Every structure is written in C-alpha cells, then in structure tokens.
C-alpha cells in the first residue's frame, strides 16, 4: 500500500502545487470570505469526490463513498472568519492566515489520494471545510446537527487538519468569554454618571480578578490557564429604582481540570465579597453571547466558548493512527496544542467522538507571518492523513489488511 500511495502521490503533486498557488495570496477577510469558500468548493468538485455540497451555514462537505456500510471517518479543516474592521486593524492577511490553508489543502487532497489508489473503504470518508469565528464555532455544530445528524453514532473518528508538526494531537485548553454583572445602590463614595468615579468603583473587582489570574491551574501538557480583563461597561444609572449597573467582561483560558460552572461561581463569589459593604447588591455571571451572520446569510446566536478536551491516548482510533504513521516514516508522538483551539471542542468535548489532530506546520507557525507555503510539508500531510484513513477504515482484501497491499 505504501508504494501505491507514493506512486499516486507523485501524480498529484502538480495539482496540489497549482491549488496552493491559487489560494496562497487569497485573503478570506475584507468581505472576500465567500469568494475563498467558492474556490474551495470548485476545487472539491474537480478532484472526483463522489458528492460535494454546501450547507446553510457555509460548511463545504465532500464525501468519498465506502464500499461497505461501516463507520465513517470525518476530516475537518477550517477557515477563519475575520470581521473587516478587526482584519484591517490587526493587519491580518494571507501571510498571517497561511497555516490554516495548509489544513484546507491537505484535507482535500488526502481524500483525492484515497480515491486515486482505488483501495476500498469499509465506510465513507467525509471531508469538511468549516467557517470558524474568533469567539466560537457554530459552523461545526450546524454541520453535525444537519448534514451529519443521522450519522453521529456511525463515526469511527474525527481528524482535525491543524498544525501539529506531524504529531497526533489529542487535546487542548478551553477558552470562553464571560461577564460579571453588578447591579445595586452603590451609595458609598459614588456619584452616578461620573466616569472617573465609576472606574474607581469597578477597580476593586478588577484588582481582585488580576490577583486570581496569577494563581491559576497549570496543566503539564497544555500549559497554564489565563485570565484577561477584556472590557468594562457602565450601563448607567436608573433613577426609577436608584440602581447602577456595570459589567466586567473577562477572557478566560482554562484547562480541562476546570469547569465552566466552577469558574462562573468563583467569579460571582469574588464580586460579592468585593461589594459586601454595599447594600442591595446583586451579582450575576454568564457566558457572553454574540449574534453572528455567515456569508450564506444564516444568522445565529452563539455562546462565546471553546471547551477544553482530552482524548485518552489508549483509544483504538488514536493508537492505530499513531502506529500507522510511525510504521511509515513519521517521527510522530502524541501531543497537545498549547495556544490554539479547534473543532475538537465540539466533536470530542460535546459529542464524545474520538478525535485527533494531524497536520503540517507547528502551532507557533500560525503567528509567524511566513508568506510561502512548503509544498513538501503539504505533501507529507496529505500522505499522513491518507494513511490514517486507510488504517482505520481500509477494507481488508483477499484476507489481507489494506496495509499489506
């Protein structure tokens, strides 16, 4: 099988290089997101998927049909959705977004390689390219609630086409944005509608949160949790009930040992303690929400959260995936992402589907600003992802496993 795959890989190199050149300088930001996804859709239609579609949320899905009715493997790559104002402010362009394009290219062409080998699969290979917002990932939820709704229990595993340095990654930290809402009669040294005075009232809470940020849990594989004050909002004074309200918006990174509920409860406890001397105070904590609109026009309201997740390394999908890589020249190990988030926050944390990550490039490359693609890395990612698919759902032929062919 290795020789067959390598032979077919040679035949794909020029096509991969052509597609890489086409999208290398494309910028999905500044209102051109739909144009970028159109190019991805057209490419998938041109490389012999058995079925290609785009759903209501803008997810592009291609299927390579298996010869049997066994469990499927789902491969997911993403494209970052960046609002125009943020995009221009931070100067993000094709350079800064290059590494997610590695995942898109390898995702499509690993399926193309599988098709060209003609090696049978026991179940379908489903290739998905999903839009991902900075604050949340509603696209992948829409995908599983709709296109994959009747197949969730028939998925052997999910492969996330993300930068792993060709390791098999099995988890990462979570990230969420939450609000602490304090409302009450802040009589002590407080004059309503005075900006400096309002900041002075909020400072004790901000100060306590800063103290907490210095003593957060650390995970030996994923790194330390984090806390950052994102915004402070004064919602004004209501003369009818003599109440003032302000909100502190917190950006929180958290390891799997922490829970969303415990984090929100602790934040509420801190705020109540800070304002314990004030009368008639109420404190609420909640996940922030954002109204989003996809390039297809679908509007959604989503909580601003990516959940942490870890998949046990002894799970067969993880074990077999790592084994097939090391048997075929990859110096792979199990690993974890330390700073990025992925669709595993939904597929593994919520749906409990075995999920791994594998791809070209290092995690830190996302922020490096490199302009040029490495075609060699892309080709290795295509080869490696194809090996993972074959090992997990390749159909034995004439008494041999697909690895023996």
Where would I find each of the regions flagged by the language model?
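Metal-dependent amide/peptide-bond hydrolase catalytic core
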Residues: 1-4, 25, 29-32, 179-405
